[in-house]
């Protein structure tokens, strides 16, 4: 079913897109908006008249087009006033914009060295015979290479139930896919593929001496590498299809390249996997621009014939000095943000943490070369060293392909609900010592004991465990497909503006600034929310050092979420945050009625001063209890589902 009110959120989310490069870079790409009635042939004619090339219609638009001026260099520091004027003065053109370029980086850590379960007898399940399968510990962890046995994606049980990704296409938005690789070629969906870097239908990677453009091919193999063919390893959804969308391999990214990539063939592509984002340097704050945001919103509204496109995002490789809530892609409600763990359950040293991460999969384990991700590589070769959250996102996309095969009617929201309910704490833990201040706040947060603080596992108001690093835990393919088979479509989703404080408040140099909003969840209105999915705190502030400003959100049920952690490398004192939607999933399933508290404080050495200018609380969820009609398959229980169902009945 089509979800209501989604487009309303695009209005305020588009406010924050102006944050970009330190120095403006102008490309030879132009966004051209024709007057009403302007069609494709008109666009071709206008482009030719002024010496441009029309690359086609912009995704999620009716009369907007992507022009390229071949006479201009790819990037320059000044606008081209002459070329802009030609289009601007054309009587058939409503608006024209020369596009700025910006940076998007691949999220791959480079190593220092270069149906019913009772129907199956799982003890007799045959493992794949592919030569690298024994190294794919994240698919079947027997304790190899010092890992923890059974800490894996539990895919063999899902395969045994007959789910292998059949009829599901996942698009790899990256630097290209080697679709002639012997482990990929039979699972390549050419009709759903395109090269937006070169503007042709062949998304083949550009070879370089340093193998830099191997990223997309490696991600593709994680999902669809063929089984039992004697080549490399096996993909999570080895009977699925992969589409290549080449869009990273050019000097600068533009809004239209991103938008067209995310809006490409939404009726043929089920899942879009992205292992890239803004620079993971601990000081960048960036997110989708206007056209890209519109493409994502249209995707979740209209993709897959109204069920919604699935966007999977790598949470980021900035490590403990970064926060993925400063990445507008990973922190979006419309994407599923995936973090990683290594083979013993510990977080990887490059893992970022944030409250928008929904779940985790796996990536390379520590410094042991035997614990990388085994997958396909360029030149028809294999690799055992794929890594970073780049490797984690495709694993999740593969699991989601299995779930969509089990139940093709799942909406984009259904898949997020399934992720919350079937992900597992398993053996995941935070292996780093962290410096957490004592807030002195009365809530349900569980602090670490001893001299070393960690991101501990917490429990929200309806009994769901979550972790600031791992979200709701590691994906479990078998649990997900079993619950997917029994799933009932989620009730309609609504968006409640719960309150606004726009009077400036000074953040004290020591201690907390606490702002409170009391809400009834828009009770009695058409926007009433009684059962939460996503919560956003839309915040504006400036401070003497942006990276030393931390924010916490506490729900009426006592769940504490750190929506902005300290980023010691971020020394900004000018831009701050303007209408930035800090998102949390940690209050999933809770009743939002009551007092919400936003806590702002400084953390770090030196003198601090700052002003919090705005706090707006946005609640997203359902009026009806989302799980009331779901009954697990006979003989199969889901403890998390049972826990939340009981909590909802008690509060009804």
Swiss-Prot record:
Glycans are attached at residues 167, 290, 451, 542. Residues 23-107 form a propeptide. Expressed in head and tail ganglia. Expressed in neurons including mechanosensory and motor neurons, and interneurons (at protein level). Expressed in the nerve ring, ventral nerve cord and intestine. Residues 1-22 form the signal peptide. Belongs to the peptidase S8 family. Furin subfamily. Ubiquitinated. This is Neuroendocrine convertase 2. Transmembrane segments: none annotated.
